[in-house]
Amino acid sequence: MIDTNIAIYAMEAHPALKGLAPCSPAISIISEIELLGKKGISAQEVSEVRALLEGFPVIPISDAIKEIAIDLKQKYSVKTPDAIIAATAQNLGLILITADKGFAKLNEVDVLIVEL
């Protein structure tokens, strides 16, 4: 599962992502909201984000994800969007690919930190 920042770097074809093995990642609905809800986003950027998202299953928030996110927030004091993204990865048994080193403290979640 990819974090919002990795989706942004993917759209920019960031060289740090070239070393990652090809996969068919999923993305949380939270990342979709973060990507499309950017203040001042242009029509061109919306088109680019939607084109990127077509290649990913967008995972909605289920009751199970909600409960895991609550547990993560209580245990680690993470921001709500990060807790939901991490909970989504944990619930699906996926590795969370991110550039945010803050996710490394979440012991319950398999995290791959991409160095930029």
Q: What is the predicted role of each segment?
A:
Residues 1-27, 37-50:
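Short, well-structured N-terminal submotif of metal-dependent ribonuclease cores
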Residues 4, 63, 82-83:
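Conserved glycosyltransferase catalytic-site signature
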Residues 21-24, 55-57, 90-95:
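Short active-site oxyanion
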Residues 55-75:
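Acidic catalytic patch
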Residues 74, 78, 94:
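Short glycine/serine/threonine/alanine-rich loop segments
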